Amino acid sequence: MTPAETRTPDHLTLALPKGRILEEAVTLLSRAGLPLTMPEKSRALRHEFPGVTLLELRNQDVPVYVDLGVADAGIVGKDVLLESGRQVYEPVDLRFAACRLSLIREVGAAGPVQRVGTKYPRATREYLNARGIPAEIVKLSGNIELAALTGLADAVVDLVQTGSTLRANNLEELDVLFHSTARLVVNRAALKLRRDRLRPLIEQLRELVQNEPA
């Protein structure tokens, strides 16, 4: 029996990432009819609302919780979803938290790219393989740009929003791997078990997104 099957059909468990996406996600879900409010700042990681349990997770863990049925649905960036490799249902592009995953190098740097630093080894490997670049990939956790500035790597692959951090550190984008926005993801078993709750939520979110000004 999966975790999704142990809960009552009328109760939803949602996985949302801590940080920049959380507030926009809660606001959008509330507009879609769920009785949610922004959780108070505390050490609590699980928040209870009428008919809904909200789990605050690290970005990378949202697809895992949804795929394994601990959460019925969640919201996560497309970049995280692709890197996870998890096979979850992705019904709605929510069109916020827009950014791009880019290949970045110090301005004026010359020579071949032999080592690449990144938090996204899966996406980076696919990109390099497709172009026949046999570079070593170094998996890093934070301050990715520093790898290019210190010589740890010849280039880095990281998310870019405005590009201001790159300009401030004499870095430039060489190529864009893909563009990313926040996505609604749903556990496939939960979609059947909680159809009466998840289908209306999906349709309401689609309508809200379509009616947002471009």
Curated annotation (Swiss-Prot):
Enzyme Commission number(s) from the entry: 2.4.2.17
Signal peptide: none
Superkingdom in the source lineage: Bacteria
UniProt cross-references to InterPro entries, sorted A to Z: ATP_PRibTrfase_cat, ATP_PRibTrfase_CS, ATP_PRibTrfase_HisG, ATP_PRibTrfase_HisG_short
Keywords, in A-Z order: Amino-acid biosynthesis, ATP-binding, Cytoplasm, Glycosyltransferase, Histidine biosynthesis, Nucleotide-binding, Transferase
Catalytic activity field: 1-(5-phospho-beta-D-ribosyl)-ATP + diphosphate = 5-phospho-alpha-D-ribose 1-diphosphate + ATP
Keyword ATP-binding: yes
SS bond list: none
Keyword Ion transport assigned: no
Pathway assigned in UniProt: Amino-acid biosynthesis; L-histidine biosynthesis; L-histidine from 5-phospho-alpha-D-ribose 1-diphosphate: step 1/9
Subunit structure: Heteromultimer composed of HisG and HisZ subunits.
NCBIfam families for this protein: hisG (TIGR00070)
Function summary: Catalyzes the condensation of ATP and 5-phosphoribose 1-diphosphate to form N'-(5'-phosphoribosyl)-ATP (PR-ATP). Has a crucial role in the pathway because the rate of histidine biosynthesis seems to be controlled primarily by regulation of HisG enzymatic activity.
Domain notes: Lacks the C-terminal regulatory region which is replaced by HisZ.
Family label: Belongs to the ATP phosphoribosyltransferase family. Short subfamily.
Alphabetical list of HAMAP family matching this protein: HisG_Short (MF_01018)
UniProt name for this protein: ATP phosphoribosyltransferase
Gene source species: Deinococcus deserti (strain DSM 17065 / CIP 109153 / LMG 22923 / VCD115)
Gene from which this protein is expressed: hisG
